[in-house]
């Protein structure tokens, strides 16, 4: 069948930002025509302090994107890891968004309909995690991989990520380059989405093009799974606290589909959780197969 280019079920950035304002930052007050005070990420309830660190990881087995203008370089992924940490007095709190101007550009040019007075404040949101803090080396912790929604960001579910880490998990998230709203690489280069659209969200694309795009997402996860086993190449201390035998995955909307699909075909993933997952493109034959691992979906009845 023919698949729409913009998944339903809260998959575009407008709905992600609405989720951000109404759920992730639950204490926000949105008042039309008045200044809205956006609060910091909610305090965590677990026992562990949280460190976070960003990495550029390159997959030399794939091109950056399938379009001619973008397939000349290897696939680049910005990856962020959150982990239980030993925080020192010189460590600095991390921000929810590092590049406010790129976020403002994305919201404005993609027609997400979020008032500028709100979007301009997102860059000032502070998190509970500390940038580049030293990992807590006294234990090993289960690993969770996070996949964002269509046009989303790796940090979009920071509230849940930090809460999980505070209870003893390592969380690995990546921006799915050219499907994320934007990606800022370590050198400051910004890559904007090539799939999110403003007035063309209902444009119909072929199933072949859809699955070509989707394969970039699932192969991103597969590549990260491989790199987790070689993470000493990036940070040996973080690698040492990852329990590689206990890996789960979760995602929002399109990321929920990405998570479920990847979990079916990778034995390394022991469990899967989807937040309002968008499952329409998933083949019925796959859904009907015997599921031999915990698979959980939190969403609306008859949606997605």
Give, region by region, the residue ranges found by the protein language model.
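Alpha/beta-hydrolase active-site loop
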Residues: 178-244
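Active-site machinery of serine-nucleophile hydrolases
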Residues: 85-90, 95-117, 155-202
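Short substrate-entry loop that stabilizes the transition state in hydrolases
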Residues: 125-184, 281, 303
């Amino acid at each position: 069948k023919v698949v729409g280019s913009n998944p339903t079920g809260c998959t575009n950035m407008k709905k992600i930002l609405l989720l951000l304002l109404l759920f992730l930052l639950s204490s926000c007050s949105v008042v039309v025509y008045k200044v809205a005070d956006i609060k910091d990420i909610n305090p965590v309830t677990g026992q562990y302090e949280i460190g976070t660190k960003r990495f550029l990881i390159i997959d030399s087995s794939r091109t950056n994107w399938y379009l001619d203008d973008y397939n000349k370089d290897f696939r680049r992924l910005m990856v962020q890891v959150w982990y239980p940490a030993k925080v020192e007095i010189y460590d600095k709190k991390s921000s929810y968004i590092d590049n406010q101007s790129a976020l403002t550009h994305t919201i404005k040019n993609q027609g997400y309909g979020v008032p500028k007075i709100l979007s301009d404040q997102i860059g000032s949101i502070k998190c509970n995690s500390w940038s580049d803090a030293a990992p807590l080396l006294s234990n090993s912790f289960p690993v969770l991989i996070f996949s964002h929604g269509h046009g989303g960001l790796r940090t979009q579910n920071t509230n849940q990520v930090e809460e999980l880490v505070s209870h003893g998990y390592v969380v690995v998230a990546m921006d799915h380059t050219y499907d994320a709203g934007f990606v800022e690489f370590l050198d400051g280069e910004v890559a904007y989405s090539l799939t999110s659209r403003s007035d063309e969200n209902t444009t119909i694309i072929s199933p072949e093009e859809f699955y070509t795009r989707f394969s970039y997402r699932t192969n991103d996860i597969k590549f990260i799974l491989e790199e987790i086993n070689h993470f000493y190449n990036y940070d040996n201390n973080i690698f040492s606290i990852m329990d590689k035998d206990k890996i789960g995955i979760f995602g929002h909307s399109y990321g929920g589909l990405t998570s479920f699909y990847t979990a079916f075909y990778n034995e390394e993933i022991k469990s899967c959780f989807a937040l309002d997952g968008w499952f329409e493109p998933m083949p019925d034959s796959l859904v009907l197969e015997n599921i031999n691992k915990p698979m959980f979906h939190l969403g609306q009845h008859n949606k997605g």
